[in-house]
């Protein structure tokens, strides 16, 4: 039972220790961007991914899962509309950030 408790209460730093070092700077950039969207942004550290939500309704707007050489993002604008994006290490963040911003602004 204590193992389950520990996994469920992992910090972002603990999560990143298990991730490929190549994707860590990109993960950090995405995390910083998500928190910049508003004071109501919360992160939920899961076993293999980090989910960013609006706190008042705990509606997630982006699910971020590190891979070996990329990051897999599921961006949710509504309960019925989810877009999957694979972000490579050398890819420009501007378009992806705009998709995340739009999801944050439209999710209820």
Question: Where are the regions that the model predicts?
Answer:
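Charge-dense, helix-prone N-terminal extensions
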Residues: 1-108
